[in-house]
A protein has these predicted regions:
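Hydrophobic transmembrane alpha-helices and their helix-loop junctions in integral membrane proteins
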Residues: 15-61, 67-376
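Single conserved hydrophobic/aromatic residue that forms the stacking wall/gate
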Residues: 1-9, 13
Length: 376
């Protein structure tokens, strides 16, 4: 399928870059062999999830990426914060997984098959109420993985793992799995207007909630984490408006600029002895020019500045929402537009507080700060 090929291509390509980045980032860690083992396992099951041609294979990949994310977030297992974050991520995702399991059982009972081609070809002949229930359960399952409102508590705390893990979880793998399920099940969702309206509302509210929460964050990685939550809201919004191709387009774009933001943030943390509080940074532009450029480019794309990749997909989602002459389409447009403004504000705030303001860190940090070795 188009969704599977696009997701797998962006996922594998981005993981290659993350692996290269991790070679230097994790070079001083005595357990880096275990780290790369987990990373490769995560890649395998994510590709399995998007490459399967039936719901059973999808479910196997879905469950195992949750296990791999637990292992990666809890990589530094002697740190209490990492233990708590990994457990929270695993437990919150179980809530959504339960709904997804029930939806798959419903598909088996209703269609007697789990192959995508068979299920989708029989969908027009099935009861609309049954398809609505399955659609709502698929939505609830996707909400857990994609950190939609109500099940989003695990995403900001998933920062406890190494920065390459944050990049994987927040850009094109774990959080995109929920959106992928909706994209892959789009022929079923089209027979349930109730499910589509619910998806639109959930996505719109999440985009606004996460963007407004991001305004109040001072942790460098948490700001980017809440931007992920907000962008997932845009993807759900697009799916609810039946604009699946646009959602897939933004999913691929988001994968790259969000990975760029996280990996660049990791380079900043590497240079500042893991200082994540933006209020204690500042003045690093002359010392970290490549990191600054990378974060600036990623932020401009996140803000949907014209001629950046994020502009072509994010602006298109808002344009399509505006063209929907229904109440939930108007709500989606206005909440999405306000969220875009808030996103621009906290993205510029991140760049300014980290690189452009007056130096607020100890002198020894500025004396030793330098760009990551990959830039040398």
């Amino acid at each position: 399928s188009t969704q599977g090929v696009s997701s797998a291509a962006s996922d594998v390509y981005k993981r290659q870059l993350v692996h290269l980045y991790s070679i230097d980032y994790m070079s001083s860690d005595p357990h880096n062999q275990r780290f790369f083992c987990y990373l490769s396992l995560f890649t395998f099951f994510m590709v399995l999830l998007v490459a399967g041609d039936n719901y059973f294979v999808l479910f196997v990949g879905w469950e195992f990426i949750a296990v791999c994310s637990y292992l990666l977030i809890n990589f530094w297992f002697t740190v209490i914060e990492a233990n708590k974050s990994a457990m929270q991520s695993f437990i919150v995702n179980r809530v959504g997984d339960m709904a997804l399991s029930i939806s798959f059982l419903g598909i088996v009972c209703l269609f007697g098959n789990v192959d995508f081609s068979t299920v989708f070809s029989l969908a027009p002949m099935m009861n609309e109420s049954a398809l609505t229930i399955i659609g709502l359960l698929l939505l609830f399952g996707g909400m857990g993985k994609s950190a939609q409102i109500g099940l989003n508590t695990w995403l900001p705390t998933a920062m406890a793992g190494p920065t390459p893990v944050s990049s994987l979880i927040h850009s094109a793998t774990l959080v995109s799995a929920g959106v992928y399920v909706l994209l892959r099940s789009s022929p079923l969702l089209e027979y349930s207007s109730t499910a589509l309206i619910a998806i639109t509302w959930i996505g719109s509210i999440t985009a606004f909630f996460a963007a407004s929460t991001g305004l109040l964050q001072n942790d460098l990685k948490r700001v980017i984490a809440y931007s992920t939550c907000s962008q997932m809201g845009y993807l759900f919004l697009a799916c609810g408006l039946s604009q699946y191709n646009t959602a897939l387009f933004h999913l691929v774009n988001h994968a790259f600029f969000k990975a760029l933001l996280f990996l660049s943030a990791g380079a900043v943390l590497h240079a500042t002895f893991d200082q994540q509080d933006q209020r204690r940074l500042g003045g690093f532009l002359p010392l970290l020019p490549f990191s600054y450029t990378s974060i600036l480019v990623g932020s401009l794309s996140l803000m949907a500045v014209p001629f950046m990749t994020g502009f072509y997909s994010k602006d298109l989602i808002l344009e399509l929402a505006c063209s929907q002459y229904v109440f939930h389409g108007s709500i989606a447009y206005w909440l999405g537009s306000i969220s875009a403004g808030l996103t621009a504000f906290y993205s510029f705030r991140l760049v300014a507080m980290t690189f452009l303001t007056y130096p607020n860190s100890p002198k020894k940090i500025y004396e030793s700060a330098h760009d990551a070795a990959i830039f040398a």
